[in-house]
């Protein structure tokens, strides 16, 4: 079945059929749907090799920068792209992949209430911006509702978390597998009472995938060694007695967390890391090489987001998707001196009250 066969069947030109099957905006939506439906019923399948060669040909005929993309800072901090401990890693990956593919980025802070959707759309069209990558959403999983028309007008992908209202395609680390693998690794090293220390708001942001992965890993432990997650980081930061009471009562032999400050809390109680208790990071960073833990590879999530949005551009896809897509990045364990490896008969720490 060829394009000409479909054209003969439907009474359109071959060029119209080709544009409709590529979802071109030049063809009315009703006509596109009619042609796409008929092509599917007739058994048409595009030749993958020819499609790739044509894409390469079109690419080679364009200038060095095919088009611009917008990198949208969704964080409350307008300087988060440089000042935040995590967000710059996503940004680095976004820029690296965009440059590899011949695109460049313009950056915008979308929490500026003076910047309306209408104004942004006007700017993006003036600058020939074709797609949007959202970075830095940390305080919740909802984007500003005042920008709804923006998400309807462009290809858009979110990094770091999955959003709701609107629900958009996203790329991020696999939070469930990240925590599960960390627990499994600690058990392999001989730890028997791992504990998870987080803030409830962070666990909620990722729809409980941190605690779910942790609890899944605990299945391998004896019932009496399954310590419930401690999700009161913010409260404990304000009142250290909360953490002290919990850790004395729970008696973990290793702590998993996102916060380096928890290591300080432990040492202030008179515990030695790793001699008395192990310490592992769920987001290991280059500036803290002394901590063992999981490398999230958030730069790769940034790269994946760029790949996804460029795919949307090539396929003429825009707006809030009916079926949002996800790319999950695998995390890897890196050992360091905060964990005893291999663990040899080290009891849970017993600090003085």
Give the label of every model feature segment:
Residues 1-58, 353:
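N-terminal helix-turn-helix DNA-binding module of bacterial transcription factors
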Residues 98-111, 166, 194-197, 208-240, ...:
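Short beta-strand elements in bilobed, periplasmic/extracellular small-molecule ligand-binding domains
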Residues 182-221, 319-340:
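An alpha-beta-alpha
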Residues 135-178, 279-292:
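Flexible loop/hinge segments that line or gate small-molecule binding clefts
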Residues 245-353:
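Flexible loop/turn connectors
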Residues 169-196, 237-244, 296-317:
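Hydrophobic alpha-helical segments within soluble ligand-binding/sensing domains
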Residues 70-71, 128-137, 157, 195-198, ...:
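Periplasmic-binding protein-like
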